[in-house]
Amino acid sequence: MFNQIRLLKVKNILTSQSFRLIDFLVYIFYTIFGKNQINLYIFRENMTDNQWKIFCDFKNDLKKMVTKWQEQFPNLKDLQKQAAIIAKTPDYPFETPIVYNLALEEISKNDEIKLIVIGDNPGKDEQLAKNNKYLVGQAGKIAEGFFNRNENLGIDFRKNVIILNKTPIHSAKTSQLKTIAKSGGEKISELIKESKIWMAKRTAQLHIELNQQTSDENKTELWLVGYSELKDKGLFLHYRDELKKSYFIDEISKLEWQNVLVFQHFSMNRFTIDLKNYMEKNCTNCEIDRKILRELGKIHRNEIFGD
């Protein structure tokens, strides 16, 4: 028999304006045949009107800021080229110095946002005019493959995930942002700092506001992937400090800090290797599930944020 949670879920499905028979059948299938427990994330839910407005306001604000920064600093591309030459980066076309993630425009009200994933900054593939999307290079393919292999998580990496960065400013390698800041002088250095602080504050606001409109079992998690530069004296120290501060402005926001998780980056399989090592040490014959991911994400969060 269905327990109370299941009955409520079925009622919500049947009364939803977006009810589709196939969604209901998928939900029933996983309820009956699931190995251990119902994965409530498997069912697709639309964003509420309020969530859709919150998301649209965010992407419009980000688009405006990217446009503003691009207009204010037309010489940024030259500095990026110079930093790449100094680092002996193989030649590539420099097309978009500050990247707005066009994948945000592909998210519709009919999509459920299950994750906000935060990378470092747009790399060579991301800044190409034909892309202008985050995590489309090798790291993105690894991330997409991870979720495809672990279908029990119920997450489509290209449909259920808002992908953002700690700064939208491009560099071939993240470390080259230091060279760009040094070569560009005080104004460019302040631009990079401003972009990190803005992204941290506005991303936290997005996360908190989305979850205020969401039931406990469907809370959106925020994953910080790649944390070496979040450590003391790291390149993203301003981002780290501003992000945490944004979650501790009041008691309601503070609750969502528990849904902020930190992981190794997807690049070079560091995420999957770290997860595998953790599972080998802490559980035998267990599957990758949300519980395991939260455990590991909290461990790394404590390493970086000290809580």
Residue ranges of predicted features:
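Glycine/proline-rich loop-helix segments at beta-alpha junctions forming the active-site rim
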Residues: 49, 176-307
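Active-site and ligand/interface coordination hotspots across diverse enzymes
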Residues: 14, 25-32, 39-138, 299-307
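Serine residues within intrinsically disordered or low-complexity segments
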Residues: 16-18
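Extreme N-terminal basic, low-complexity initiation segments
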Residues: 2-4
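Short amphipathic alpha-helices and their capping/turn segments at secondary-structure boundaries
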Residues: 96-109, 142-155, 210
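Short loop/turn segments at strand-loop or loop-helix junctions that form parts
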Residues: 115-123, 163-174, 225-228, 263-267
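Short, surface-exposed acidic-centric catalytic microdomains
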Residues: 146-181
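Polybasic, lysine-rich low-complexity intrinsically disordered segments
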Residues: 9-12, 36
